[in-house]
A protein has these predicted regions:
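Short hydrophobic beta-strand that contains or immediately precedes a catalytic carboxylate
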Residues: 61-63, 87, 202
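A short, compositionally biased
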Residues: 14-16, 143-146, 173-174, 205
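A mature extracytoplasmic/lumenal domain signature
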Residues: 31-33, 64-66, 116, 184, ...
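Binuclear metal-dependent hydrolase catalytic cores
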Residues: 1-26, 117-133
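Extracellular adhesion/carbohydrate-binding repeat motifs centered on closely spaced tryptophans
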Residues: 165-206
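Short, polar loop/linker segments at the starts of domains and inter-domain junctions
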Residues: 38-44, 99-102, 188-190
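Core dinuclear metal-dependent hydrolase active-site scaffold
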Residues: 12-82, 147-165
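Cap/insert and terminal regions of metallo-dependent hydrolase folds
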Residues: 71-146
Length: 206
């Protein structure tokens, strides 16, 4: 791009060059520090970039592989602000998406690029308490969608995902299946529902 189109290649970020417009969207880059080059970190995920996309008054935060092992989420909690949509950090694995961080961002929608089974119970509970509507890559594949698409506009946030369907997830930490509907745990669901391990019966339980 630099050679063919004359695009400027920026590798050193400052407060002044980490934000730019892309069409009608404001793009803001987070976790751009370079301390890891001198102090070292145990994993490259610790310096994963986060990207906030804002259109009008609506926004999304794409958290890449960000985690909180070095306190990155603690810092972002006071920097990013509330968002409409959150792509969860580090595939939803333990050590990421901490309760205080999620509470600060308070997303209406969350998407996990990983399996629900690896999602810590505390994370799932934090999302449920906030009313954040959940979906994952497994759901997208099961529905035969090419991709999960979230659209930000001046009028609001929409998605191509069908949240109305009841869905069942298995939590390794809890050792139990959970039923979701509308992107949230549904404690009143009663009936048969098919999961990875076969058909399951729920009787007013999630």
């Amino acid at each position: 791009a630099e050679v063919e189109y004359g695009a400027q290649l920026i590798q050193d970020f400052t407060y002044f060059n980490r934000s730019f417009m892309l069409g009608s969207a404001l793009i803001q880059l987070y976790n751009t520090g370079t301390d890891y080059q001198t102090t070292g970190v145990f994993d490259a995920n610790c310096f994963s970039l986060g990207v906030k996309v804002t259109v009008g008054t609506h926004s999304a935060f794409l958290a890449g592989d960000i985690n909180n092992f070095t306190g990155v989420e603690d810092e972002l909690a006071s920097q990013v602000g509330s968002v409409d949509f959150l792509k969860m950090g580090h595939h939803g694995c333990p050590g990421s998406n901490t309760a205080a961080y999620l509470d600060a961002l308070s997303p209406l929608y969350v998407f996990q690029t990983g399996k629900y089974s690896m999602l810590p119970t505390q994370t799932a509970q934090s999302l449920a308490n906030m009313g954040s509507r959940y979906a994952s890559t497994d759901d997208v594949c099961a529905d035969g969608l090419d991709a999960y698409v979230v659209t930000l506009s001046a009028t609001g946030v929409t998605s191509n995902f069908d949240y109305s369907k009841p869905r069942v997830y298995y939590s390794e930490e809890a050792g139990a299946y959970r039923c979701y509907q509308g992107g949230l745990p549904n404690a009143s669901f009663t009936g048969w529902i098919r999961g990875d391990g076969g058909w399951l019966w729920f009787d007013c339980s999630s």
